[in-house]
Amino acid sequence: MSRAPAGFADFFPTAPSVLQKKRSKAAQDRHAANTPKAADPLPNLGLSSTPDIKGGVGTSADNPVRAVGERSAETTLALGDTNGATSSSSLSTGSSGFFSASAPPGVAKPNGISSCALTPLTNTDSSPPCKIESPLGSKSGSTDAAPQLAPTCEAHGGPEPVTITPLHTPPTPRVQARPANSEVKGHKITYDPDLDRKFPSKARRRKPQYETFGVDDEKDPPPCDPRMAIANYTRGAACKQKTKYRPTPYILRPWAYDPTTSVGPGPPTQIVVTGFDPLTPIAAISALFSSFGDIGEINNRTDPMTGRFLGVCSIKYKDSRAFRGGISLSASQAVRRAYLECKKEQRIGTRRIRVELDRNGVVSGRMVAKLITAQKAEFPSLEESRKESVGDNDNRLPIGDGAKKDNEQSKDNLPPSTAPKGPSGRSSLHPSLLAPDGPRAVLKSPVPSRIEETPILQQIKRDPYIFIAHCYVPVLSTTVPHLERRLKLYDWKAVRCDKTGYYIIFENSRRGELEAERCYRMCHMTALFTYVMNMECQPYGNPNYERSPSPERIKAEKREKAKRERLHREMELDIEEEKRLRVENLDPAREALSVLIIELRDKLLDDVKSRVAAPALYDFLEPDRHNAKRQQLGIPAPEGTGRPSFRIDASTDGTVVHSQPDAYSRHHRPGGVSSLNVLALPRIRKVKGFEQGNAVYIDERRRAKPRKREFRPLYHRLQQLHEIEDSDDDQQVSFARDTEEVESRPLSRLSSESAESDNEDDLMRKSPSLLDAKPLDVPLPESESLAGGIEQSGLPDREKSIIEELERGINTLPTSSKKRKRLIEELATRKKRKEVDNLFELDAKPLESLVEETAQEALPADSTDALRTVTPVLKDKKRKVKGQSGKQIFEERQAPKRKEIDSTQPLLFEESVELLPEGEIEISEPAIEELKPEVEWGVSTDEPRPTAEDDDTIVLDLDGWQSLIKDDEDINFLKKALSEHLAADIGNLAAWTWKHKEIKAINRGGDRGPVHSETRIDGYYVPNPSGSARTEGRKRIRESEKSKYLPHRIKVQKAREERLAKAKNDPHAAAAEAARLLAAKSLSKSTSRSTRVNNRRLIADINAQKQALPMQNGDSDVLRFNQLKKRKKPVRFARSAIHNWGLYAEENISANDMIIEYVGEKVRQQVADMRERRYLKSGIGSSYLFRIDENTVIDATKRGGIARFINHSCTPNCTAKIIKVDGSKRIVIYALRDIDRDEELTYDYKFEREWDSDDRIPCLCGSAGCKGFLN
């Protein structure tokens, strides 16, 4: 065992303090010896020397338990001295409980553990059977338990001598706060020799004297506090320098709640409102409580069984960054304002309301449960019927967990699990339940309210007034006296208020008008308590007031109204009479006869004009008939004797009018070129398969089945990309049959096949007219010259009209229509053919006129000069035709040799014409084949010239190199020059060359072959002053420069320029185009049947909302906004010609319709300014900041919808409005006018005008009313 370390007394045994402790300890020992009864009760117990099972005691020598008891008594005594006078009582109690056990202390349990183990936490209840009680047990079971425990212990084998060893520590004595009166509480010293100054220090050997106290507690009253004897001690009079005595703790001011550092629930953000009429609409409650802060959630509680309103409303507020004036308001502050304001007799309707704080919804839940319980007690029949239904369900269902759960729910006033989720609309259990009145309020004398129910604005006529809206200063009866005192410096007549706001009314005179204006100037936007008085001054009274008309005017209006009604009635009677006569005289045969007569008359007139009148006029105007008269008058003869061409157009503007093809007509083509010649019979071509193709109009089921596409490898498809072998018309079958809709009609061949056949006839007719040319002294046949002249003159106009008709059809059809796709392909084919014709200059000048002019120039000269004149012209003409045959190339090579041949003039002409034999002109696009450059070896006869002339201006691209290398010698030289360079891996050579040539053709607008200029866009490649763009730094490109090279802007700019030029040159065509656009706008905007059904349901839903909601200011905008959320207008964004991206309509939109909401992140003005600077620094040039009011801005730059892509226009088709929905402001885009499909949406940004500014933003809208700048 380890010894305790030596202390101070061991080293200094003669120290005064050590001696004093020894004397004190000796005095305590003597005092303990003098009082044995109170200190040690163990000697008073009679203990036998031998162990006795019945007695349960033994001597100290034979029984070791006694020794343990004595040691524990001594330890307890020592503790009792330390704690006061409580040790003797505790010791006596513990000893009596310990020694009163009936079992002998030495009895051990069968498991070898003694039952007398002393544990500090053992009590009577926790002791196991056959175990004596704890030494700290109660006295109640001390003697009665002995007879019961003795047999049990005997059953285990009788007494056995065991050694009892205490476990760990002895039991802790139980210290009493109030010991018995007979116990000594303590000792106090009455004489201390160390403090006696009468005796010298050497004589101070007397012993200290002690006196006990606590024995007679009744005789000795408790001593009083000596500090209370001092006057005003509790107020700090005892010591001025020390702190004031405070018997109670300080009442500190509570700390403000901080969610980051505070612990526990925060301040309440929810209130519960009662006392109003249960039938009050929720809009009225929201209008009142939204004046205290932004409402996050509002719930008008209902009965879950019947669905009726209970008159209890829970309102939860949310934090607002800028609430009515820019101040930030938290949800707890809003709740506090609402709670304090509604204590002052607030009313909703005619009832006073009561507001209570509801932190977690407990208060509202308790109120709802109380009201539901009251209703059950008031209508027991309804509850019994519900219980019966529930009981039937319980009988049908097995009893289990579900039934227990239903019982628990019924105990908690909740509906059962089998109950419906909401009230049924067809239930007959709807008794007339009385509305709860809410919590009882303190009855006070009713104060007359100064808030008028009748709108004040309707009562004001010409009196000057100032209006303060309720959204700036809440309407309260108590605010009116404060407002009157606030405006006491001004001479007003009355201050009135209604639910819209406050009206300060002045007298109706000039002085009143001036006083109203002065009050407005001095008090506008000033403070009234914590609100801002945003005033609206009307010095001339109600602007909407109209004086009642005079009696004479009323009489005149009545006479006019009666006259209009009379005329309307007479018109209706006439219409009814006409209908009746039509029904009586209805005869289909007579009606058909009248229609037939009209058509025959028109046809007869047309035949007379074309077959009788026109030939007669031309015969009369024949030049040969007037030779004598011309000679008599001295008029020279006309130059040509041939009959001039004659043309009859169906329309005066040059357009071709197409009609719907007749299903029973046998003429596949309309009146073509031959019908325009009055002297020629109509030529009807027999088309192969015409009967089968025309039968489709009669019955679409006779259409031939489309053949399947042949599968080809990718390489062959790449080579045959431009070969049109499979038509889309063969693959498409109409889904709508036997209808008159545009979608159900097959593609009309009036504008395609007829025009194609006409073009083919024209091209085939041009070559015979050229090949059959004869010397000029022989006149041509009249029919050939007339027909050729008509066709050549009418070809460009007819082709142009067909293209315009196709474009008009494309614009009128919807985007998803298959017919529109076919028309687009047809239009592209015709435009490509027209470009080829322009390239070959076929319609610029007829070939026969070129031959005639060449022949006329060749007549006066000799044959050699004529040959030199005619042959280069024809050769130059042939060079422009790419589809030449090998015979033509051979004739060109033989042309220099033919110069030496001497022949006559007619033979010369025929030789020159034979250069283009019949059938050798190939002007079809698929037959275009580039000629291989070759060297014509020969000897020049007139002057020396090089064998091959190289053009140095040709751009050396793929086509340029191919034109530069003409023979094998050039190939060998090129190989030697490139021998040092490694060959690049380009894969398939044919595919690589085809790809590069196609890219070049696309970039150059279809031009192929060698070119003399680089492929670039003018104005796009801007040279840098330093020679490198990297050394120039960052700079912004102007929008005007972007318009020069961006493809979509170039396209729009070209279209705009062409439109303006066309309108300037041909005003009639511009007027026709405007009429077409107007007709397109007036087209039916009908949609599919399912869409119409959905629209009808939506309208019914909106009408139901209109009936449910009260009609207040702004309700129409709210309803239309709800409609917008349910059915959004289909819009899309794409590249815009104005700026970057734009928004386009995907369907026709009517005027005043809501299109889309401008959504984004709501920020304050200061944050918006900071973000705008940050965006400019980061390179985001576009601004998507939209201001709602003075302090709030919507930022849609990074968090926004597609409405931010709407561009600016000086003549827009949309406008932006700010509406208020559920207490928050929203930005919605409206349509100003009817918007067509695929039209870009624009609105006016309304930037402030900046004068003499260098940083003005140019406007690129390109409209007729463009101002040039946005600011």
Curated annotation (Swiss-Prot):
Assigned keywords, A-Z: Chromatin regulator, Chromosome, Methyltransferase, Nucleus, S-adenosyl-L-methionine, Transferase
Domain SET, chain residue ranges per copy: 1129-1246
Biased amino acid composition, Low complexity: 84-99
Sequence motif: RxxxRR motif, positions: 1092-1097
GO biological process, one term: methylation
Single GO MF descriptor: histone H3K4 trimethyltransferase activity
This enzyme's EC code(s): 2.1.1.354
Location(s) in or outside the cell: Nucleus; Chromosome
The Post-SET domain, residue ranges: 1255-1271
GO cellular component: chromosome; Set1C/COMPASS complex
Segments for region (Disordered): 1-99, 119-183, 382-447, 722-797
Reactions accelerated catalytically: L-lysyl(4)-[histone H3] + 3 S-adenosyl-L-methionine = N(6),N(6),N(6)-trimethyl-L-lysyl(4)-[histone H3] + 3 S-adenosyl-L-homocysteine + 3 H(+); N(6)-methyl-L-lysyl(4)-[histone H3] + S-adenosyl-L-methionine = N(6),N(6)-dimethyl-L-lysyl(4)-[histone H3] + S-adenosyl-L-homocysteine + H(+); N(6),N(6)-dimethyl-L-lysyl(4)-[histone H3] + S-adenosyl-L-methionine = N(6),N(6),N(6)-trimethyl-L-lysyl(4)-[histone H3] + S-adenosyl-L-homocysteine + H(+)
Functional description taken from the UniProt entry: Catalytic component of the COMPASS (Set1C) complex that specifically mono-, di- and trimethylates histone H3 to form H3K4me1/2/3. Binds RNAs which might negatively affect its histone methyltransferase activity. COMPASS recognizes ubiquitinated H2B on one face of the nucleosome which stimulates the methylation of H3 on the opposing face.
Family recorded in the similarity comment: Belongs to the class V-like SAM-binding methyltransferase superfamily.
Protein name, as recorded: Histone-lysine N-methyltransferase, H3 lysine-4 specific
